[in-house]
Amino acid sequence: MNNDETIDTLNTLIETAKDGEYGFRASAQYLSSPEVKQIFARRADACLQATAELQSLVVGMGGYAEDTGSAMGTVHRGWMAVKGTLAGYSDRAILDEVERGEDSALSSYRKALEQPLTPELRSVVERQLEGVKRNHAQIRALRDQVRSEAA
């Protein structure tokens, strides 16, 4: 993999991390649970840290680091807003949509690891993937908890 391809791969992950940050922050404002709002704020901060780390790597490689999320992430957040307006912003619906976003993040990180990265970059991407997995598991557990409370 040449330098430009590696930078493209990292920039895709930057967009993914920015999507996560924006998604957690946007979703938090509609949640009813203060505890879940705090969890979302921490998740957004973790995504912001992941973004900064990836941006630093891209700049260190002589590339231009993305500083926005993806078009698909913007569409997903827009869909969440429309769906929330039509169906109401229930914690369950929000958690369902955030989990869908985390599914997408998992896919992006796994795809990046299919690329021939340097050992240093692979280590960073693997570590960040573990964070995405933790986010996903936590969101799923919260969603399941909300479902069981509603039953």
Where do the model's predicted regions map?
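Alpha-helical bundle segments that constitute or directly flank the non-heme di-iron/ferroxidase center
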Residues: 2-32, 92-116
